Curated annotation (Swiss-Prot):
Classification of source organism: Viruses, Varidnaviria, Bamfordvirae, Preplasmiviricota, Tectiliviricetes
Species per Swiss-Prot/TrEMBL record: Fowl adenovirus A serotype 1 (strain CELO / Phelps)
Record's protein name: Uncharacterized protein ORF12
Length: 210
């Protein structure tokens, strides 16, 4: 699926792995918290999204423009990831408080029940079209964007298909092979580049034997 879109599979899977495993160390440091999956309904974006959601337990699906923080605060300890599907609104990110969720920061907000503490949570946002960068609530080092253009072929992916890559990534980490890991990092900050682009980055253009 990723290769059909022109993505370098090892680079793309490493980016997804970093998104899944990245956690906040300090409020002064940004980290990848939100995955934006972009593509029209006819593309493979929905199938890819469904495949990602199957990797997580206790996913809460919500409308980012009508997020009930009071209700969420009572169950947030059970939630492992927040999924925001496409909305009919042109301005998807119109709620500045809800946008804080996408940044991966803990914060306090007022609800009908009073002040509540909201902890950081992984987020997946499904978009039909990508807004201009200045309209995204997250910075490039707080998100990863994967875009789909090709028609869906009805096939998703399963964790077993990722296990070989993830096992190899764990080996590289255990061996402290930082050079090999750096070689898998897409140089296009915040958005995976495709081999179909005129000038993809070196990581995405190169072959990786992992």
């Amino acid at each position: 699926m990723l290769e059909a879109e022109g993505y370098n599979a090892p680079v793309a899977i490493y980016a997804i792995y970093l998104w899944m495993s990245a956690m906040s160390i300090s409020r002064l440091c940004h980290y990848t918290n939100t995955l934006y999956v972009v593509g029209e309904p006819s593309s493979a974006a929905d199938i890819f999204t469904a495949s990602i959601l199957r990797l997580f337990q206790f996913v809460l699906t919500a409308n980012i423009n009508a997020f009930d923080f009071g209700q969420y605060a009572r169950q947030q300890d059970l939630v492992k990831m927040l999924y925001f599907p496409c909305t009919a609104h042109c301005n998807t990110f119109k709620d500045p408080v809800a946008n804080q969720l996408l940044k991966g920061r803990s914060f306090t907000t007022m609800t009908r029940d009073g002040l509540v503490d909201i902890s950081e949570k992984k987020c997946l946002v499904r978009l039909y079209q990508l807004p201009h960068p200045e309209h995204l609530p997250t910075a490039p080092d707080e998100h990863i964007i994967i875009r789909f253009y090709e028609p869906a072929n009805g096939c998703g992916f399963f964790l077993g298909e990722l296990s070989r890559y993830i096992h190899r990534i764990h080996q590289l980490q255990a061996d402290n092979d930082n050079d090999a890991l750096r070689a898998l990092l897409c140089e296009n900050k915040g958005m995976l580049c495709s081999r179909s682009w005129t000038s993809p980055c070196n990581a995405c253009h190169s072959s990786h034997d992992i």
